[in-house]
Amino acid sequence: MNDRKRAVQARVYGRVQGVGYRIWTRSEAAGLGLVGWVRNERDGSVTAWLAGADAAVSAMIERLRQGPAGASVSRVEVEEIETWTAPGDFRIVA
């Protein structure tokens, strides 16, 4: 069994604010057993910080590319985080 842990910061662009993207992200991430946070950015994008099992993080990145109904994702930029301390749950922070 692969229990490798991974953390990433993903920036999601497109029509991702005002469509329930953060609430959807929190629900999807929690369902995959991930911890982290999601927030709106001033430029209209959304940033998500995700940590957990490697396979779950990869699955969540794919889900971010799809987004919830009403969203239209144009691109997702992913940055690997080498050193991290995870919060105990998944939160909407802004």
UniProtKB/Swiss-Prot annotation:
Q: Which UniProt keywords apply?
A: Hydrolase
Keyword Hydrolase included in the entry's annotation: yes
The UniProt catalytic activity note for this protein reads: an acyl phosphate + H2O = a carboxylate + phosphate + H(+)
Q: Where is the Acylphosphatase-like domain?
A: 7-94
Catalytic site residues?
Answer: 22, 40
Instruction: Give the EC number(s) listed in the UniProt record.
Output: 3.6.1.7
- Give all cystine bridges in this chain: none
InterPro entries according to UniProt: Acylphosphatase (IPR020456), Acylphosphatase-like_dom (IPR001792), Acylphosphatase-like_dom_sf (IPR036046), Acylphosphatase_CS (IPR017968)
GO molecular-function term, one example from the UniProt record: acylphosphatase activity
Gene3D superfamilies registered for this protein in UniProt: 3.30.70.100
Q: Which PANTHER family does the entry mention?
A: ACYLPHOSPHATASE
Belongs to which family?
A: Belongs to the acylphosphatase family.
Q: What is this protein called?
A: Acylphosphatase
Name the species this protein comes from: Mesorhizobium japonicum (strain LMG 29417 / CECT 9101 / MAFF 303099) (Mesorhizobium loti (strain MAFF 303099))
